[in-house]
Amino acid sequence: LERTMTERSVKRGEYLYQGDRDCTGVFWLRYGQARVFLISGTEKQITLYRLLERDSCFLSASCVIKNINFDVFIQAEKDCRILLLPANVYQDLMEKSFPLATYCNQILASRFSDVMWVMEQTIFTSLDRRLALFLLEQKAIDESSDLHITHEAISNHLGTAREVVTRM
């Protein structure tokens, strides 16, 4: 396993995964921060969840996960260092190890729960409340009351237009 894993650095703003353009494999974030998001046909974005230090991401191996019919994108929000397990090795391990498959399914279920929360918020919660919740979350992640984030970045997280965030 150790021989098949690679380690790489990803700069802030770079993509760790770009939907159907690649099948990277499973990665673990040694340090840094990334966002997992969708992009619509009109280039609108919405953040599904964030990856923080020591988080793993299985959707970057979606080409070997059955019935994943959507493309996610993963972009570094801060400089990152990742450990990468190739998709074919991951698939082989999943077929041979029931405990590993169970563990991975638990993480996927947790991420699905995160996505459903975003969906619920987007559909049933007013934008001003979603914006307030986002800013509080950002404050907690940054561990600072001073937030350095653009209206464009906020709108990408919330799945709305920059002009809407500016008017809020």
Give residue ranges: language-model regions.
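Short, Lys/Arg-enriched, Trp-marked, Pro/Gly-tolerant hinge/linker segments that flank
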Residues: V115-L127, E143-S144
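Cyclic-nucleotide recognition modules
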Residues: T47-Q106
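Regulatory nucleotide-sensing modules
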Residues: L1-Y31
